[in-house]
């Protein structure tokens, strides 16, 4: 959309979650500019920002990602594992909605299944999230964001019961 409109743009990509490299801070900044002169100016400014902030980033995570993406067998394995995780998280979203309904939570919970990714905004407020932590040992941030990837068949009922208790 931006490219076809002739707009310059930047895209920040993180590989931390999709490669389970949380402590490595692996990512990329891709920049599209109108011409080579503008690209050179942007690159110059980015180099200044990089030098000021961290100078030499760690390379281990980047090397892992590069190896996986450029080795066909490893890339295929990674893509299959990623697809499996996406499916599991999608199934957990559905199971979470079903469990919350069984726990007596009223209303439309379809927002949980319509969201994508490892996290979901639960609609819980800061006080409710603090109660989940202190009373039930269930952790999320005060904005109500919870990690759906951490929900599984073994803890689903306990999570749903705890959410019902704090509402």
Predicted regions and their residues:
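Active-site-proximal segments of catalytic enzyme domains
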Residues: 1
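Conserved PLP-binding catalytic core of the aspartate aminotransferase-like
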Residues: 77-135
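PLP-dependent enzyme catalytic core of the Aspartate aminotransferase-like
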Residues: 5, 98-102, 124-167
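Catalytic cores of large soluble enzymes that bind and process phosphate-bearing ligands
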Residues: 53, 57, 84, 88, ...
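Active-site lining segments that contact anionic ligands and/or coordinate catalytic metals
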Residues: 6-7, 24-26, 114-118, 135, ...
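A structural signal for short secondary-structure junctions
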Residues: 57-59, 111-114, 140
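Conserved core segment of the aminotransferase class I/II
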Residues: 7-14, 20-79
């Amino acid at each position: 959309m931006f490219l076809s409109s002739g707009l310059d743009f930047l895209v920040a990509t993180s590989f931390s979650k999709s490669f389970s490299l949380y402590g490595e801070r692996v990512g990329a900044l891709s920049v599209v500019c109108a011409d080579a002169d503008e690209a050179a100016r942007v690159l110059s400014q980015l180099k200044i920002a990089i030098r000021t902030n961290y100078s030499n980033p760690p390379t281990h995570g980047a090397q892992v990602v590069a190896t996986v993406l450029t080795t066909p067998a490893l890339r295929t394995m990674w893509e299959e594992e990623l697809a499996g995780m996406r499916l599991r998280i999608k199934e957990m979203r559905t199971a979470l909605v079903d469990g919350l309904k069984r726990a007596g939570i009223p209303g439309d919970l379809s927002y949980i299944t319509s969201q994508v990714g490892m996290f979901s905004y639960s609609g819980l407020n800061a006080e409710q999230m603090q109660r989940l932590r202190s009373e039930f040992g269930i952790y999320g941030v005060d904005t109500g964001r919870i990690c759906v990837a951490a929900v599984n068949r073994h803890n689903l009922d306990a999570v749903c019961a705890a959410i019902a208790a704090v509402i």
